[in-house]
Amino acid sequence: NLKQVNIAIRKFHTIYNLHRYIVITPYESTLYFKDAFCDCDYVEIIDENKVLNKKKFNELCAEFLKVKNDHKLFRINWYYQQILKLTYTLNYKNFPGKRIIIWDADTVPLKKIKFFNEEDNPILYGSKYEYHIPYFECNNILFGKKIIYPKLSFVTQFAALNSRMRKDLKNVLVKYIKSSNITFDKYYAAKAVLHSISIKHDNEPIYGSHFSE
């Protein structure tokens, strides 16, 4: 991924005037990334464990999903990546009061994309290609009500959020944690998502895809 990330960020920097780029990577890769971007003072490399401790996440998976048959088939590493991004995004100490863009590491921008409109609200991009019902089932549990969604997937290679949306999403998950009598701590996002997966019905096998950030 190092080569792709290097190309993507340098391409991004020629298209956009962004404040800072954050690369979150496993600890063993941090030195390689720092060397690759040693000439870029606008790039910061972060060990993923400082955002979401992987050992603790594994423990939470075992705790919340033990009620599921074949819970050992749960795709821990894949879900870790989803919740890692969510955890970083919801920490308001990261770029307080600013808009942020989450960008997949294996994606290179080819031309400028408009992320926000004139009212500072994110522009939504969707397609029918990856419309996946279990994602929306988890959302309904987390939001505490059934929402009528368009039959589109908003799973793209990026996500744009403004400051208000980040705060609102955090409030939704905190409310869910409290209503479910789950202990609130810095792992609240992981707990909320894993709990919602644990109580949803089993249309999708446990090794399937139940949630996407």
Say what each PLM segment does.
Residues N1, N77-Q81, E213:
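Phosphate/oxyanion-binding active-site loops and adjacent basic polyanion-contact surfaces
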Residues N1-L2, Y27-T30, K50-N53, A105-L110, ...:
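Short, solvent-exposed loop/turn segments at secondary-structure junctions
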Residues L2-T14:
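Short, well-formed alpha-helical segments that are part of the catalytic scaffolds
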Residues L18-S29, I45-V51:
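Short beta-strand/loop segment that forms part of the nucleotide-sugar
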Residues F33-N91:
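Active-site-proximal specificity loops/subdomain of glycosyltransferases
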Residues L84-G126:
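GT-A fold catalytic core of metal-dependent nucleotide-sugar glycosyltransferases
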Residues K112-E204:
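Conserved catalytic core of nucleotide-sugar-dependent glycosyltransferases
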Residues P205-E213:
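P-loop NTPase catalytic cores that bind/hydrolyze ATP
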